[in-house]
């Protein structure tokens, strides 16, 4: 098992010993082996959705814990294949993307329709597939930062996927169209029995103010999570909160001083706890992003993110670039270290 405290270094006490005095843990719907029976059973989802959610929970090293470790590799579209895979050309072959997820003991592999369809007959029965339905691509010039549908829910269903995912750029000029598209797609996915995952991202230049990037503020991302749950996301993928006070900084929208005085603090665990509260207190699971590859600090950064997510009450981590931009052996090692956080009973809910 990974020595978590050693990796956290000087931050170990503030992260591992923190007690949340903002939103109590007993008000949350926390992950666990019985999450489907305890939480999802209340929803209007068809039985097949519950079955597929349980399939996700039963797979990989975290099987039976209620936590999720997902490998996402859609960057070939989002960031260009060359930029994504030049460090490891073997990942130009979709087979190796899926093999990385299997070798690392992930609950699920998430990728584009093309990647997963090209190997679906070989792998769909070996590891759960999550098909990403829409993407932003950077070949169009000038870049517009919009999300375009690349595949249908039926295409994902027919290849044997248990889940579909999509991104909405909340706050962007195109967000209302995206909300309509993805709300309809999630409705169709649920009818076919698939789990729905929303990348609930913010996108607006106005969210950068005085040198601070409020795309990762707890209050604004929290509202994005609330909108994600509103359109039927079973799981919400969100960037980990790094600051707060986005509403006040941009001087737009609605907030309340108690969000900052009572419901959050400066501790990152409390900021993520607020993100989770906006996921209907955990009725929709919260998974945080692993972030960009950063070199020598990747292992420490990934474990730190996992500790914050777990202690806040989150459901897991969706980590891609930090893993597939390394050798497969090193990628497996990094993902396993993240999983060790969720397997370690000493890392408790704050």
Positions of predicted regions on the chain:
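N-terminal amphipathic alpha-helix/helix-capping segment at the start of soluble metabolic enzymes
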Residues: 1-79, 84, 117-126, 274
């Amino acid at each position: 098992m990974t020595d978590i405290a050693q990796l956290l270094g000087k931050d170990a006490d503030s992260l591992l010993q923190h007690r949340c005095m903002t939103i109590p843990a007993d008000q949350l719907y926390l992950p666990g082996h019985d999450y489907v029976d305890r939480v999802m059973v209340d929803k209007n989802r068809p039985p097949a959705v519950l079955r597929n959610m349980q399939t996700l929970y039963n797979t990989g090293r975290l099987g039976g814990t209620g936590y999720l470790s997902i490998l996402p590799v859609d960057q070939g579209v989002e960031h260009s294949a060359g930029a994504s895979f030049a460090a490891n050309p073997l990942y130009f072959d979709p087979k190796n993307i899926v093999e990385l997820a299997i070798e690392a003991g992930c609950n699920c592999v998430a990728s584009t329709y093309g990647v997963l369809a090209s190997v679906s007959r070989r792998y769909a029965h070996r590891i759960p597939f999550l098909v990403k339905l829409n993407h932003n691509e950077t070949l169009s010039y000038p870049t517009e930062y919009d999300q375009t549908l690349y595949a249908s829910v039926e295409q994902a269903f027919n290849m044997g996927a248990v889940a579909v995912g999509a991104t909405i750029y909340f706050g962007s000029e195109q967000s209302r169209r995206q909300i309509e598209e993805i709300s309809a797609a999630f409705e169709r996915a649920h009818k076919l029995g698939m789990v729905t995952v929303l990348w609930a991202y913010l996108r607006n230049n106005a969210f950068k103010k005085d040198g601070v990037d409020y795309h990762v503020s707890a209050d604004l991302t929290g509202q994005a999570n609330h909108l994600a749950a509103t359109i039927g996301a079973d799981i919400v993928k969100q960037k980990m909160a790094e600051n707060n006070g986005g509403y006040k900084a941009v001087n737009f929208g609605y907030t309340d001083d108690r969000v900052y005085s009572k419901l959050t603090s400066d501790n990152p665990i409390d900021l993520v706890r607020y993100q989770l509260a906006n996921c209907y207190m955990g009725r929709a699971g919260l998974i945080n992003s692993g972030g960009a590859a950063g070199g020598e600090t990747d292992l420490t950064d990934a474990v730190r993110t996992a500790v914050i997510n777990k202690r806040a009450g989150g459901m897991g981590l969706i980590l891609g670039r930090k893993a597939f931009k390394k050798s497969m052996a090193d990628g497996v090692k990094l993902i396993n270290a993240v999983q060790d956080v969720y397997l370690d009973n000493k890392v408790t809910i704050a």
